[in-house]
Amino acid sequence: MNAQEANFDGLVGPTHNYAGLSFGNVASLNNEKSAANPKAAAKQGLRKMKQLADLGFAQGVLPPQERPSLRLLRELGFSGKDADVIAKAAKQAPELLAAASSASAMWTANAATVSPSADTSDGRVHFTPANLCSKLHRAIEHEATRRTLSTLFADPAHFAVHEALTGTPALGDEGAANHTRFCAEYGKPGIEFFVYGRAEYRRGPEPKRFPARQTFEASRAVAHRHGLAEEATVYAQQDPDVIDAGVFHNDVISVGNRDTLFTHERAFVNKQAIYDTLTAALDARGARLNVIEVPDAAVSVNDAVTSYLFNSQLLSRADGSQVLVVPQECRENANVAAYLDQLAAGNGPIHDVLVFDLRESMKNGGGPACLRLRVVLNEAERAAVTSNVWINDTLFASLDAWIDKHYRDRLAPEDLADPALLDESRTALDELTQILRVGSLYDFQR
């Protein structure tokens, strides 16, 4: 059956702010406590979705999570009415209020790991929400993520939505940001590629400055629960030196699609062995791996981190050609811009480069790839997604007007203490569930 890769982007939430919560994420730390523009952030992401949908790519949207999370704040000991909880947290522990208010669920590459039905033992699409246990503000996401995915992908004949792995350092799981898939065609069996930063029970190199968030054990557990064939599953370790340089997920240093791996020469430990293993595995699936390795002499790791060259989307057109979707920061870095010009002019599979303004997300360390969750669906599976989440002219207009109606154009750290922000967010999300036809998705609606 024909299949297509759909990208489900996270809609930026009304509490988008710069709290500097993500140690190891250079952009997040550099922009700590600056004022954010939630309205601009949401519109920038929505415009990317619309342009890609207009180009013929399957484009869906995932709703924001409810923030601030009163559930977290109450769990942490703040009591009283909702406004009292926020006021107490703001006075006694503003860092916890910031964690409870983060809009980080917008980066849906961390929402889950997804295996298409062509790869799984039971012929269903499998989702495992990421536990994101390395960061408090993200560790609170997985239950709502599971609820959202279970709502959109509800038919058990086609979909299996698992619980997140147990939230312990040994099973630290950051989702699809450390996972990609190679195949001859989307609907045919492929190779699933899991990248980890460290192993809990194996000796090996580890970063010294910043934490490795993904473990080998978590990647292997996801592969096992999805029923992936052992010979079609490849594991690789990310080079700890690039983690220490700010590459906190593999999608900051590599991106793959179909038969192509676009990567930096310093991305992996024992890279040639990894290339050889991927090549042999993909050859058995009827395709030849094409590695586009960017040399450090052309684009340094620092260039990659500041421009987010590899935090790009690599998309296949109907004619088989590929397009690279990059943030505008790539055009503002001379080395990266020169490399992209050379890449597009060459004879390789990447023929076009699309540039987007995602400045608000980028200042928190999230580029095009962070904002999307890839889900390969065949025709029957796509038909089973009955919510109004596919971007078209009508939905775009509704969401654009919804953002104009409900979002602030400035949100500074001190604004998180405003109890009106909670009311504004809940009003907005209540209306959004009607637009997307997802029912009573949020705790406050139940």
Swiss-Prot record:
Recorded superkingdom: Bacteria
Pfam families with a match to the protein in the record: AstB (PF04996)
EC code(s) of this entry: 3.5.3.23
Keywords: Arginine metabolism, Hydrolase
Catalytic residues (UniProt): E174, H249, C370
Enzyme class, UniProt record, top EC level: hydrolase
Pathway as given in its UniProt record: Amino-acid degradation; L-arginine degradation via AST pathway; L-glutamate and succinate from L-arginine: step 2/5
Catalytically driven reaction(s): N(2)-succinyl-L-arginine + 2 H2O + 2 H(+) = N(2)-succinyl-L-ornithine + 2 NH4(+) + CO2
Family: Belongs to the succinylarginine dihydrolase family.
Protein name: N-succinylarginine dihydrolase
UniProt organism field: Burkholderia cenocepacia (strain ATCC BAA-245 / DSM 16553 / LMG 16656 / NCTC 13227 / J2315 / CF5610)
